[in-house]
């Protein structure tokens, strides 16, 4: 029994060490061109604190700005998650139907985080409400 516990702990330590080594600091110039253009267009006035390439299961990239905002990109340089800690997500990024829904239903709130994948887009408002939309930008879930 003792050998099994030691083996399990050893495997856990190795797995943790291996995955920790998959994050690699990079320069912004090493991001895919699509990501570089996106940052320049929507976040050009912000200073980058760090950029890293993650190679866990799928290659991805993360940028953190000195003001606390973060952007995650997929391997092609398309954004997957934008988290603006102290400001609104730039309106040009938000799909028009989602921006309209939020403006119509929550006029006093702003979108501070947006996350998308192949099936849905989820936004978080500054009042902590989360709204999930399907591919056609219809509301499918809300979390208060």
State the predicted function of each range.
Residues 1-23:
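Bacterial Sec-dependent N-terminal signal peptides
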């Amino acid at each position: 029994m003792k050998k099994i516990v030691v083996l399990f702990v050893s495997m856990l330590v190795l797995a943790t060490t291996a995955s920790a080594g998959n994050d690699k600091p990079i320069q912004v110039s090493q991001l895919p061109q699509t990501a570089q253009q996106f940052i320049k267009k929507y976040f050009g006035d912000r200073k980058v604190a760090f950029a890293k390439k993650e190679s866990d299961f799928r290659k991805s990239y993360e940028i953190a700005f000195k003001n606390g905002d973060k952007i995650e990109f997929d391997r092609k340089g398309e954004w997957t998650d934008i988290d603006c800690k102290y400001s609104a997500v730039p309106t040009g990024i938000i799909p028009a139907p989602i921006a309209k829904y939020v403006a119509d239903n929550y006029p006093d709130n702003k979108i501070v985080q947006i996350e998308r994948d192949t099936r849905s887009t989820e936004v978080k408002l500054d009042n902590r409400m989360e709204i999930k939309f399907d591919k056609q930008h219809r509301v499918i879930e809300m979390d208060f």
